[in-house]
């Protein structure tokens, strides 16, 4: 806080002009009009106004401005988040980036802050500059540490920002990256899975009367019942083969890929609606065809190792030799034809 100096030997000294960073409580300017700081930056709302900051994004356990606080003209957004690796920050990034972008387009100066100003707020600002400048995680991190050397996002946020980059700087809920991430988050929250969110499940292909253009269905080899679509397959990079079986990897994987795995003997997929009753309340078990009860594979919320050596968590594993791939081609009359 800057204060005017008192008189000295009868001579008045004029108070120095406060910079936006000093008035905002030790916030640093990352981009013109974009500031990064901790709780001290919002301790005195009047300092924000003096600094010309009229938009504040709080990433913390509590909002910076309770109802009625702040000052007239202040725009604020509160994102509840703890500085823990298991915190889901990824799901909020689009909203945060949009808030910052909108405020700056209106000529507002924006402050992004958390409690200490080194992890949560850094992760959000990184997401913004990654998207606006099309930067890699590493490049954005280097930029932030240049202006704020103490910046250090936790390993969970680091993984989430790399997923954000892999999805093209937006949270794509249809992406295999996001589906695998969402499954891992559900596993962390629910040691006893009695109530699974419906959005976790892919639609049962038998409930859709018309196939999508160039769609690929996977059917039970024994009874031909449709089981899942190609879009439900969660790709992964191939492991190092037999040597990978020396230990089991249970840490979150940042090596997801949408490519194919030629040496893998199973598909790892997102849960499908017909699996719901099988998955509730248990951590592992068999996956059986809902029509003929033929064994298709297995599931384990703690994860399974693919034949290529890659550890997948959680795992919904369908053996390739238990299903047939059927490509559906559109024909006249909005029907579909099997290739």
From Swiss-Prot:
Subcellular location: Nucleus; Cytoplasm, Cytosol
Gene Ontology annotations for the cellular component aspect, listed alphabetically: cytoplasm; cytosol; nucleoplasm; nucleus
InterPro entries, per database record: Dual-sp_phosphatase_cat-dom, DUSP12, Prot-tyrosine_phosphatase-like, Tyr_Pase_dom, TYR_PHOSPHATASE_DUAL_dom
Modified residues (N-acetylmethionine): 1
Gene designation per UniProt: Dusp12
Organism this protein belongs to: Mus musculus
Coiled-coil residues: none
Cofactor note: Binds 2 Zn(2+) ions per subunit.
Protein name: Dual specificity protein phosphatase 12
Family: Belongs to the protein-tyrosine phosphatase family. Non-receptor class dual specificity subfamily.
Hydrolase is among the record's keywords: yes
Cofactors that this protein relies on: Zn(2+)
All copies of domain Tyrosine-protein phosphatase, residue ranges: 26-170
